[in-house]
């Protein structure tokens, strides 16, 4: 390897790749992958840079997936050092993307370099799926690559996404799935009138309140071995004209389900509508299914990750499905086994985002050890 994981991470962190820009990150990575025999394919869409790089043509196919884009920096004067000028202070590397998730991308590349050097004739194939559209709308990123791979009948046997999954120390948590996300905009209709004469109208906020209370108190399911119970939360309520003397004619309530495999989107929609009907509301709902839940149970990939973390970090990892959605929701459609394994998440998206320097070689070693268990004869 010409660079350590730290040096490669610093090079791509220095690229100001605010979503949906790649800002040269993938060019740096391609420089490292081509000498290893990776074929390079861009599956770009609507200005988004998407890379599919593959070494080998046979099964099993092991993929490292991730993103090179980062969230905006926020106020530059709040940063202790410039966000795109990576700096080490007291054993910690600072810069936008250090945790989410350029360090993981660098670690996956150096892990593959080391693995291929030691196992040049390894069975199966290795690949990288990288996008510059994960932190934004994600309409033209990983999903575009998945659609292209699906169209030509490709299936991923194993996939690791380098999202920052650890909580307190590297390796203490691995995501083996994610909950689904189902959002809705509920419009409850009333009759606008002068607030001094409420009998001449119908206040939709008052009418909706009992139903909302019941929805908030409903147990949607009890979860299961891998998932916490489904939750329902209101995110926004808007009603009225802004005047203090007008009963509003309607109220809009935005809400979200984070749901487990113990429920289905269709079942949740039906149950919610039944509660609204019980309260005799005049309403409309617009639904958006953001993601279905996905899960990798115990098996070769989870066992390999558990072993690797035990050997490298000296701890037992926890398999978890908590947290928000990720690009795994797209990859799951064509992947048999998938995990998210990455650094501590505490500073992701924050001012002075950072990662412990000693976590970088360890993360690379974890990735390499997983490859050694699954991709050697």
UniProtKB/Swiss-Prot annotation:
Reaction(s) catalyzed by this protein? N-succinyl-(2S,6S)-2,6-diaminopimelate + H2O = (2S,6S)-2,6-diaminopimelate + succinate
- Keywords, in A-Z order: Amino-acid biosynthesis, Cobalt, Diaminopimelate biosynthesis, Hydrolase, Lysine biosynthesis, Metal-binding, Zinc
A GO MF label: zinc ion binding
Q: Which InterPro entries match?
A: ArgE/DapE_CS (IPR001261), Bact_exopeptidase_dim_dom (IPR036264), DapE_proteobac (IPR005941), Peptidase_M20 (IPR002933), Peptidase_M20_dimer (IPR011650), Peptidase_M20A (IPR050072)
Q: Summarize where Zn(2+) 2 binds, as residue positions.
A: 100, 135, 349
EC number annotated for this UniProt entry:
3.5.1.18
Short name of any one Pfam family annotated for the protein: M20_dimer
Q: Where are the transmembrane segments?
A: none
Kindly identify the residues recorded as the active site. 69, 134
Pathway info: Amino-acid biosynthesis; L-lysine biosynthesis via DAP pathway; LL-2,6-diaminopimelate from (S)-tetrahydrodipicolinate (succinylase route): step 3/3
Q: Which PROSITE patterns match?
A: ARGE_DAPE_CPG2_2
Write down how the cofactor binds this protein. Binds 2 Zn(2+) or Co(2+) ions per subunit.
Tell me which NCBIfam families the record gives.
dapE_proteo, PRK13009.1
Q: Which HAMAP family did the record assign?
A: DapE
Function text: Catalyzes the hydrolysis of N-succinyl-L,L-diaminopimelic acid (SDAP), forming succinate and LL-2,6-diaminopimelate (DAP), an intermediate involved in the bacterial biosynthesis of lysine and meso-diaminopimelic acid, an essential component of bacterial cell walls.
Q: What is this protein called?
A: Succinyl-diaminopimelate desuccinylase
Native species: Dechloromonas aromatica (strain RCB)
């Amino acid at each position: 390897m010409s660079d350590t994981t730290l040096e490669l991470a610093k090079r791509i962190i220095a690229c100001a790749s605010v979503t949906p820009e790649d800002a040269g990150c993938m060019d740096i990575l391609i420089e490292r992958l081509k000498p290893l025999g990776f074929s390079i394919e861009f599956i770009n869409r609507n200005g988004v840079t998407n890379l599919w790089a593959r070494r080998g043509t046979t099964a099993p196919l092991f993929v490292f997936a991730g993103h090179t884009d980062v969230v905006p920096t926020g106020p530059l004067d709040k940063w202790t050092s410039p966000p795109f000028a990576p700096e080490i202070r007291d054993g910690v590397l600072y810069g936008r993307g250090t945790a989410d998730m350029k360090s993981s991308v660098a670690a996956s590349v150096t892990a593959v370099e080391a693995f291929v050097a030691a196992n040049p004739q390894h069975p199966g194939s290795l690949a990288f799926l990288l996008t510059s559209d994960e932190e934004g709308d994600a309409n033209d990123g990983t999903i575009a690559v998945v659609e292209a791979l699906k169209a030509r009948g490709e299936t991923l046997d194993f996939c690791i996404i380098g999202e920052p999954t650890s909580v307190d120390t590297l390796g203490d948590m691995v995501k083996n799935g994610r909950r689904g996300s189902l959002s809705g905009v509920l419009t409850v209709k009333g009759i606008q009138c002068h607030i001094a004469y409420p009998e001449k109208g119908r206040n939709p906020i008052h009418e909706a309140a009992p139903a909302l209370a019941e929805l908030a108190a409903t147990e949607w399911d009890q979860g299961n071995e891998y998932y916490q119970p489904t939750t329902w939360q209101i995110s926004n309520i808007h009603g009225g004209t802004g005047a203090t003397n007008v009963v509003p004619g309607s109220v809009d309530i935005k809400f979200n389900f984070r749901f487990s495999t113990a429920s289905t989107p269709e079942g949740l929609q039906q149950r919610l509508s039944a509660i609204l009907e019980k309260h005799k509301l005049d309403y409309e709902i617009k639904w958006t299914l953001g993601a279905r839940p996905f899960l990798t149970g115990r098996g070769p990939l989870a066992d390999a990750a558990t072993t690797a973390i035990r050997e490298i970090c000296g701890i037992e990892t926890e398999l978890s499905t908590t947290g928000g959605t990720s690009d795994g929701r797209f990859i799951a459609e064509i992947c048999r086994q998938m995990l998210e394994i990455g650094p501590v998440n505490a500073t992701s998206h924050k001012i002075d985002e950072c990662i412990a320097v000693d976590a970088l070689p360890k993360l690379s070693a974890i990735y390499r050890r997983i490859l050694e268990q699954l991709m050697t004869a």
